[in-house]
Swiss-Prot record:
Designated gene of the protein: DFR
Annotated PANTHER family: NAD DEPENDENT EPIMERASE/DEHYDRATASE, STEROL-4-ALPHA-CARBOXYLATE 3-DEHYDROGENASE, DECARBOXYLATING
pH dependence: Optimum pH is 5.75 with dihydroquercetin as substrate.
Enzyme class: oxidoreductase
GO molecular function annotations of the record: dihydrokaempferol 4-reductase activity; flavanone 4-reductase activity
Keyword NADP: yes
Name of the featured protein: Bifunctional dihydroflavonol 4-reductase/flavanone 4-reductase
Highest taxon in the source lineage: Eukaryota
Organism the protein comes from: Malus domestica
Residues that hold NADP(+) according to the record: 44, 163
Any Pfam family hit: Epimerase
Family of this protein: Belongs to the NAD(P)-dependent epimerase/dehydratase family. Dihydroflavonol-4-reductase subfamily.
Length: 348
């Protein structure tokens, strides 16, 4: 548990992972400095300010990955930093300058800020499975020694390619800098993060994870042979590794593997009202699962708490509660209403 006097900084604190991590850090007794791009934008920060203990243990700081040195003030005096912020624009017209360079330079800027502060004992970076397995031919099992093929990403330009390139190059540059400058740096590599959430808008990872419900066909390839982790498990692993004195290097954080067919079978059973497709253009009916090994994380003592069903039920419930996905009216109710001419219903 953190001490009340121990301050930690969370970058990208208003986002999907960042806001949940802030909530858990506050619960664990830490004083949190949360960086956001615009602390005055109530729509973007209200879910942080409404958290229990926010009034006494949370402060918001203005910082942007594109502005060199903008994290220095927030990090000064902190004993730990959780760098979660990352550009997540899959549709960028200028990916090199809008996504890739800001990600690399932003992470190096955080490392430099930690050096300048002289108080930071550990920096935890939220990396991505996109740094591990994006290559022409999938292996059956991936671990922390694997890296994505950047040239393959640049040549094929699949959905999200600039995100995979940016995270891979940023993490590699950071490892070089951390080793040269003797910084205690660890990276956590989540697979696709699913679960309930605090932010008001649709998290990018749920646009992908819920793509069979949302009919986002361009994202089906990403979950063809998918790996998943619950948002809460991921955030608790950040705190666990930060607090563990022997944690070092990279850690894959993934609790479940599922092909798109296995995922859809579960979703159709839970949500028949969405009429989720069972056939996917260009995707073989007989897929072998691809496994991301969390052996290293488990061996240091971390335990996952949530099932695949927990993740998706939590995500769908949160999206429905926030009005981000429609709640369809069951067909039998629609038919009954039409027959009685009581109401003109549109199935969502």
């Amino acid at each position: 548990m953190g001490s009340e006097s121990e301050s930690v900084c969370v970058t990208g604190a208003s986002g999907f992972i960042g806001s949940w991590l802030v909530m858990r850090l506050l619960e664990h007794g830490y004083t949190v400095r949360a960086t956001v791009r615009d602390p005055t934008n109530q729509k973007k920060v209200k879910h942080l300010l409404d958290l229990p203990k926010a009034e006494t243990h949370l402060t918001l700081w203005k910082a942007d990955l594109a502005d060199e040195g903008s994290f220095d003030e927030a990090i000064q005096g902190c004993s730990g930093v959780f760098h979660v912020a990352t550009p997540m624009d899959f549709e960028s017209k200028d990916p090199e300058n809008e996504v890739i360079k800001p990600t690399i330079n932003g992470l190096l800027d955080i490392l430099k800020a930690c050096q300048k502060a002289k108080t930071v004992r550990k920096l935890v970076f939220t990396s991505s499975a996109g740094t591990v397995n994006v290559e022409e031919h999938q292996k059956p099992v991936y671990d922390e020694s694997n890296w994505s093929d950047v040239e393959f990403c640049r040549s094929v330009k699949m959905t999200g390619w600039m995100y995979f390139v940016s995270k891979t190059l940023a993490e590699q540059a950071a490892w070089k800098y951390a080793k040269e400058n003797n910084i205690d740096f660890i990276t956590i590599i989540p697979t696709l993060v699913i679960g309930p959430f605090l932010m008001p808008s649709m998290p990018p990872s749920l646009i992908t994870g819920l793509s069979p419900i949302l009919r986002n066909e361009s994202h089906y390839g990403i979950i063809k042979q998918g790996q998943y982790v619950h948002l809460d498990d991921l955030c608790l692993s950040h705190i666990y590794l930060y607090e563990h004195p022997k944690a070092e290097g990279r850690y894959i954080c993934s609790s479940h593997d599922a092909t798109i067919h296995e995922l859809v079978k579960m979703l159709r059973e839970k949500y028949p009202e969405y009429n989720i497709p069972t056939k996917f253009k260009g995707i073989d009916d007989n897929l072998e699962p691809v496994h991301f090994s969390s052996k290293k994380l488990r061996e240091i003592g971390f335990e996952f708490k949530y099932s695949l069903e927990d993740m998706f039920v939590g995500a769908v419930d949160a999206c429905r509660a926030k009005g981000l996905i429609p709640i369809p009216i069951p067909a039998e109710k629609t038919e009954a209403a039409e027959e009685s001419n009581l109401v003109d219903v549109k199935v969502g």
